[in-house]
């Protein structure tokens, strides 16, 4: 038996974020669609060749997306909401961009599709919309075109398709309610057509992704897999692909499916190799994900060699692969020229992970474990590194008591003290934190970072931008202000730069959604705060106005989830280390006179384990970390938190347990649907439902905002409602920001007047 290796997908954006730059240039009207298409072709060709050169046997095709792979699947199926359809019924690249962004260089602007997290990652997908009686047909042949590209270049390819059951699972019903699972029989003919086209191209294996199988699915959804895959049998072999967690709970169903292979994530899953050997049919190809696609740490290949021996001994066909798509990993470690060599030796980015697969498959095929020893040596040396361990942090963690996570009084007492202190009007208006990161701001930070600007001139420049943000907000009539975060490159990276235990890359970019990329810090050791982080800028901003200015912190769970974490200690331990560091920041902000402090936790739900049976333990420590961070605040200090793209109904107990005085949430894309959870739960504290979508450049009208607020007021008492955008305004321009906020403030003022009348 020859063991092949493969990846489940590769980063799309390019080492220098070429795709992002080409997208944004096209959207701004500065380049043509053909120029954008050329960049895409060049990136795909480069990435295929890089994987091949690294020793990957089978190259993924179909992992590239112009915005998001779920959105690509929607277009493939002809699933385009009426508001985005072209008059002639055609589907083109601008159709895709209108769905993702709400507008494109051609076609009429309309509300963008809802966006939410891809399982428990920091990647976002565009939620498919389903209506009763919907028709599907093959209207977007991107996958087939890209397979033709790769074949023309002489590559051995493995097309990648998002599976039909997972696709339906990820979507939402619009209009009259119905069971979207009933649409399965309608989308399967399109899948059959695509598979038939691939068979014509002599494709042997198709990777069909069904990550929903890593969930604890309702019985009717689990039962849907058998008829679905009965219908998809054909000339091509199907590699049913799962990832992000174990599938043991669904393995009996999976093993009865008419497929020829199965991919299992052994990194994040708890599936025992003995269970796989006994349950997965002997004649199936078994592919095991052994290289972590979601982190940056070098794999212990020597350990994997030993762990895989029972499979090598018993399986007729075995592949090794990445645990999931390498989409979630930076591209190339070799360009990181500023990393300390010891620390650098601990890491592997996407290209290095491809090399790891080649090394391990070669060692397995040649029964040569000695060939892996040099690769695994830095992993063992890291265990004893002084960069990793800080005794003082461990002592402080051990001294935590339950009282440390409790505010002095309950919300009703605190609310009274806060009303007396701030004297805010009904329908108080605020923003979520950041203001537009202009070319000038980015240039200022870059010049300072690269040594072209000294600290004094940098701070003077940042102070001017903060002053401008305060002036703009006062002119607009906002009630609670923010300093605008001009000094911050990223809400997680900024804090990581000021905390011990973090390191940073130069080019470690990963895609979050569309053209949005983030450069997560890496947590390499125990976390502590050497000095105050945000206090001076918050204090300066507050000195410019009589209105309250919020202190802005990123919460411990979000910093954890949006960083590449250590793997040698628990996530709970890391979160509580961060919480203790930020607790000191809350205390220092209070001492500086900051009376409203926002602790953002947009990633709280994202951190949930995929198995609902594991939620309780996670939520307990995640909530405790937030409270540990916030509970040092006095009664008249108002603690806000903000959450993104969340379904709240099944975690409302935990949301309430955070005990934040005000929670702001993203609701505009869901037309305030998310507030139903708060209404049914009778959420006791204050809520700011987002009234417009900041991810779209479309400016909401006063009437639009009023309508959403009135809809919110049907569910939440007006005395507990705040008025705010969905999220921070970092990615928007000042012109649209002014227009949108002016309309938002006017809507709040109109409602105040109506309330008095």
Swiss-Prot record:
Its EC number is 2.1.1.14. InterPro entries: Cbl-indep_Met_Synth_N, Cobalamin-indep_Met_synthase, Met_Synth_C/arc, UROD/MetE-like_sf. Binds 1 zinc ion per subunit. L-methionine binds at residues 432-434, 485, 600. This is 5-methyltetrahydropteroyltriglutamate--homocysteine methyltransferase. Its cofactor is Zn(2+). Signal peptide: none annotated. GO terms for biological process: methionine biosynthetic process; methylation. 5-methyltetrahydropteroyltri-L-glutamate binds at residues 17-20, 117, 516-517, 562, 606. Pathway: Amino-acid biosynthesis; L-methionine biosynthesis via de novo pathway; L-methionine from L-homocysteine (MetE route): step 1/1. Pfam families: Meth_synt_1 (PF08267), Meth_synt_2 (PF01717). Zn(2+) binds at residues 642, 644, 666, 727. It is an enzyme of class 2 (transferase). The lineage of its organism: Bacteria, Pseudomonadati, Pseudomonadota, Gammaproteobacteria, Enterobacterales. One of its GO terms (molecular function) is 5-methyltetrahydropteroyltriglutamate-homocysteine S-methyltransferase activity. It comes from the Bacteria. The keyword Metal-binding applies. Catalyzes the transfer of a methyl group from 5-methyltetrahydrofolate to homocysteine resulting in methionine formation. It catalyses: 5-methyltetrahydropteroyltri-L-glutamate + L-homocysteine = tetrahydropteroyltri-L-glutamate + L-methionine. The keyword Zinc applies. The active site is at residue 695. L-homocysteine binds at residues 432-434, 485, 600. Keywords: Amino-acid biosynthesis, Metal-binding, Methionine biosynthesis, Methyltransferase, Repeat, Transferase, Zinc. Belongs to the vitamin-B12 independent methionine synthase family.
